[in-house]
Regions:
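Gram-negative outer-membrane beta-barrel transporters
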Residues: 3-74, 141
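Generic recognition of flexible, low-complexity loop/linker segments
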Residues: 53, 91-92
């Protein structure tokens, strides 16, 4: 599976006029600036490989899955002064199936990529939410 996207989203009519405390007008023109929170590029590459095991095997089926998700550049403000560059995370999963039971071993952000998941400004301060670090897990499933 392969998906990619390019977005060119800019302001076309966004001008703000505010007044200073002394009454002097300040005009800010955002025309041509990128719209915040919209990644310029997104990318997803994924694949799956399944092995049907022999009747003598303990497992009925083994499935390997991997995908790479990427996004960027993402601007966080209308001024386009804070942004996240293009980044990607690699995820994988291995499923071991035995009849109606399955055990899965998985990892998210396997390359431990450091990235900003979200950013906002309030009261003249910027706050950034970091993306999740590398995670590992095991899932157990039983169908009735």
């Amino acid at each position: 599976m392969y998906k990619r996207q390019y977005t060119y989203a800019t302001f076309t009519d966004y001008v703000i006029t505010e007044e200073k405390k002394d009454g002097t007008p300040i005009t800010t023109d955002y025309n041509g600036k990128y719209v915040p929170f919209v990644p310029k590029h997104t990318l997803n590459i994924g694949g799956e490989y399944a092995i049907t095991c022999s009747p003598r095997s303990i497992f009925d089926r083994v499935v390997f899955q991997a995908n790479y998700n990427a996004a960027g550049r993402i601007y966080w403000t209308e001024q386009n002064d804070v942004s996240q560059s293009f980044y990607g995370t690699l995820n994988w999963r291995t499923n071991l199936e035995i009849g109606d039971a399955m055990i899965s071993f998985w990892a998210r952000n396997f390359l431990n990529k450091d990235y900003a998941a979200f950013y906002f400004e309030t009261m003249n301060k910027g706050f950034m939410q970091k993306g999740r670090p590398m995670q590992f897990g095991v899932d157990l499933r039983c169908r009735f």
